[in-house]
């Protein structure tokens, strides 16, 4: 593969500086990311809406063509197994996205339900993960850049709203452009046929030079989403977490005519106990201390009552932040807890942290509309 010694950072400090620069570029100007790895499932048929309403916890029957919606998927026990955004192409056609690691298992699970339990539904599934490339354009200046790249779409805020999509032509290539965001910033995801992926990437990079566009990767993305309190299934959940455990009661439909997978399990008393682990934020008293992920939260008897799921230094906030699962966590917001960590050459140490909301940045969600 040749000599690529100059293409990687040489120290932990260099790595952290790179992440910082990329996060700040996204928050203050514009960044771009290859989001092609997300799973994609094409859902078609007269009962496509009904199918989505059964596999997701929220409602899909009234989602208009041209719109997108975030969905949470549970198993029969009511535990979160995946999440993603699905796009309504027309009344009988949707494109579902899944987590990168969950693409194959979600597709297999959906086929199992369709073939063994709901064979009466007119629905056809196709895995299209490899058929599309996705370039995410993210940051306050994203709208300005998209106007340069695509002249046949009206990108004004009132005409292209958050969680909508539009067909258009980007640098001469047919594309579906979704206005969705995993950073909390104004963002557009350009979806094109896979063989045009590199070409569109280069065109976006070239057009964005006037705003010092900065490519960023998974590590920076993790920081950005944690600042907004967005979960990653499999990192902030562990197969035993319900939507309520991660503060997402709002995504549980109350009036669906047909129950969705996992709905009946939510009536089990054990899943409604205040003693369950709940998603919270942690703010270290020493703002420069970044808690190791997996560290245990201990009570005054030294027993574990939770653990750190995600932990980063936030460049925009100038301090460390962490997400954690804490027993009865929501009732402890504002209180001080201890996190036990292992320090190299120093042994065990207990770090005092304040329990906080899991949303650290732009709590009101104003940044998603970007600059005028």
Task: List the predicted regions and their residue ranges.
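Single conserved hydrophobic/aromatic residue that forms the stacking wall/gate
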Residues: 1-15, 19
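Short, solvent-exposed secondary-structure boundary motifs
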Residues: 2, 23, 71-79, 166-171
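Well-ordered mid-protein domain cores that form the structural environment of catalytic cofactors
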Residues: 58-113
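Short beta-strand/turn micro-motifs at beta-sheet edges
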Residues: 27, 83-84, 178
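Acidic, proline/glycine-enriched N-terminal capping motif
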Residues: 13-16, 20-71, 79
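Short loop/turn microsegments at loop-to-beta-strand junctions
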Residues: 6-7, 69, 292-294
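Conserved, structured C-terminal
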Residues: 13, 89-372
């Amino acid at each position: 593969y040749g000599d690529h010694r100059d293409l990687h950072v040489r120290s932990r400090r260099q790595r952290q500086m790179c992440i910082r620069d990329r996060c700040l570029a996204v928050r203050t100007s514009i960044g771009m990311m290859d989001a092609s790895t997300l799973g994609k499932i094409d859902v078609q048929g007269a009962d496509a809406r009904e199918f989505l309403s059964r596999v997701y916890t929220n409602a899909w029957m009234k989602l208009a063509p041209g719109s997108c919606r975030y969905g949470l998927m549970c198993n029969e026990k009511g535990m979160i197994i995946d999440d993603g955004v699905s796009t309504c192409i027309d009344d009988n056609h949707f494109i579902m996205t899944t987590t990168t690691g969950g693409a194959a298992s979600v597709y297999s699970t959906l086929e199992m339900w369709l073939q063994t339990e709901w064979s009466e539904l007119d629905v056809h599934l196709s895995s299209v993960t490899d058929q599309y490339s996705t370039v995410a354009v993210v940051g306050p200046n994203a709208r300005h850049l998209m106007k340069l790249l695509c002249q046949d779409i009206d990108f004004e805020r009132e005409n292209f709203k958050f969680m909508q999509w539009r067909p258009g032509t980007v640098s001469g290539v047919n594309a579906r452009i979704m206005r969705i965001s995993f950073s909390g910033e104004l963002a557009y995801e350009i979806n094109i046929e896979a063989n045009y992926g590199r070409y569109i990437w280069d065109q976006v990079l070239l057009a964005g030079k006037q705003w010092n566009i900065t490519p960023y990767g998974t590590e920076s993305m993790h920081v950005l989403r944690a600042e907004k309190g967005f979960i990653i299934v499999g990192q902030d959940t562990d197969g035993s977490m319900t939507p309520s455990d991660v503060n997402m009661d709002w995504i549980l439909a109350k009036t669906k005519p047909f129950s969705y997978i996992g709905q009946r399990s939510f009536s089990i008393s054990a899943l409604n106990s205040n003693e369950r682990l709940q998603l919270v934020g942690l703010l270290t008293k020493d703002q420069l201390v970044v808690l190791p992920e997996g560290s245990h939260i201990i009570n005054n008897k030294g027993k574990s009552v939770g653990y750190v799921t995600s932990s980063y230094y936030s460049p925009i906030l100038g301090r460390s932040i962490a997400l954690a699962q804490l027993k009865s966590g929501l009732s402890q917001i504002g209180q001080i807890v201890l996190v036990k960590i292992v320090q190299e050459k120093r042994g065990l140490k207990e770090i005092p942290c304040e329990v906080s909301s899991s949303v650290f940045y732009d709590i009101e969600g104003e940044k998603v509309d970007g600059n005028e």
